Amino acid sequence: MSYQQPQLSGPLQRETDSSDRESLISGHEHGGKSSQSAAVFNVVNSVIGSGIIGLPYSMKQAGFPLGILLLFLVSYITDFSLVLLIKGGALSGTDSYQSLVNKTFGFPGYLLLSTLQFMYPFIAMISYNIITGDTLSKVFQRLPGVDPGGWFISRHFIIVVSTVTCTLPLSLYRDIAKLGKISFISTILTTVILGIVMTRAISLGPNIPKTDNAWVFAKPNAIQAIGVMSFAFICHHNCFLVYGSLEEPTVAKWRRIIHTSILVSVFICVLFATCGYFTFTGFTQGDLFENYCRSDDLVTFGRFCYGITVILTYPIECFVTREVIANVFFGGTLSSVFHTVLAVLIVTAATLVSLMIECLGIVLELNGVLCAAPLIFIIPSACYLKLSEEPRTHSDKIMACVMFPVGAVVMVVGFVMAITNPQDCTHGQEMFYCFPENVSFTNTSWSHLQLTT
């Protein structure tokens, strides 16, 4: 987009409430064309994207009561850091995350941010391939006359075919605007999926035994759970685009938009995480759809919707990775031939890695702790602390001082725990409660089931 952030009059040494109400792009006479409601929709869609499928798993990792508290905490920090980024842009006179970090920490900071902004969507592409293979393989198994054990409906074959026929061609577009309708379609499909998860929480949940520690307050893997939540909530890479698209954008207006967006998003996320975890408790997988029985046609439809959602979202992530490489190494300009070659190389690399990984949970954890956590917790707070001349007792500075070490702990400890204490998954296996002899589990203890299944 052509919007430019002008230099502000004065260094903004004191960001008071009155200055927050002033336009931060006063040099841009007309601003963008997006309404506040459209901006809210864009932010909500960014948050409740494909990462929402792992939120019930994060409840299993952290313990349900602590997991809900952590979900609210991550949402609050996301809210705060999104506002902090725009304030940092105002202080530095920049209009993008990259230019903000470059202005604040120079070229080394720019390279670090670029690395994170490449890694996050690239690992997301890997997770999308895993989800596509897991979900669509079970969809095709329900088709009449299809051999459930056939190689042509195996997850590996489906990943390769969906890549060649769908995600790669879509990833070759040079203009991301051509993918503009994807966000609306994805939001509709995500709403359908939420409805299915809620329905099965009521109809299926009471028939599945609860594990012994299902309602324990906290579990040792809470740090990894924060990583999964961070993966779901991150939308910082496009906040400057949304802000710049507003008519007469101001910090006060942006703050209202973010508060509304995060409030809606956290309501949906808590509902999804609660319904998913209540249904399966300690059996919850990183990919929630792995928990449902293959014979459940309603869930099969949900799998189809989710598979389509991630296929449509995949090209956007590829666009980001390609743009990062183009900006860092080629000055932002690629020839048509090299654009195609680079897209093919990125998609091929993501596909090869996804074929070697079975469990979605570890991918969500690593992407959350290695990429999402620094992009949400560390970098926004570091930029603001260096740029702002507010007193140390100012509430924003206090919060930024808390966010920075918390993000560092989540990143380091979460990575170590994800590697040294990986969680098992039952990829490709039918869960025990799906077999005919276990049709009803009401008033049945889990310890008894362990002896009989």
UniProtKB/Swiss-Prot annotation:
**Could you tell me the membrane topology recorded for this protein?**
Multi-pass membrane protein
Question: Cross-referenced Pfam families, in alphabetical order?
Answer: Aa_trans
Q: Does the keyword Transmembrane apply?
A: yes
The residue ranges crossing the membrane are 39-59, 66-86, 106-126, 150-170, 179-199, 222-242, 262-282, 299-319, 337-357, 359-379, 398-418
* Cellular component GO terms held in the UniProt record: membrane
- Ranges for region Disordered: 1-34
> Does the record's keyword annotation contain Oxidoreductase?
no
Q: Which residues are glycosylated?
A: N438, N443
Q: Where in the cell is it found?
A: Membrane
Query: According to the UniProt entry, which residue ranges have a biased composition of type Polar residues?
Result: 1-10
Keywords attached to this Swiss-Prot or TrEMBL record, sorted alphabetically, are: Amino-acid transport, Glycoprotein, Ion transport, Membrane, Sodium, Sodium transport, Transmembrane, Transmembrane helix, Transport
Q: Where is the composition biased (Basic and acidic residues)?
A: 14-32
Q: Which GO terms describe its biological process?
A: amino acid transport; sodium ion transport
**Taking the first listed entry, what is the main subcellular location of this protein, grouped into a coarse class?**
membrane
The Swiss-Prot or TrEMBL record describes its family as follows: Belongs to the amino acid/polyamine transporter 2 family.
What does the record give as the function of this protein? Answer: Putative sodium-dependent amino acid/proton antiporter.
Name the UniProt record assigns to this protein: Putative sodium-coupled neutral amino acid transporter 11
In its UniProt entry, the species of origin is given as Mus musculus
**What does UniProt list as this organism's lineage?**
Eukaryota, Metazoa, Chordata, Craniata, Vertebrata
- What gene, per UniProt, encodes this protein? Slc38a11
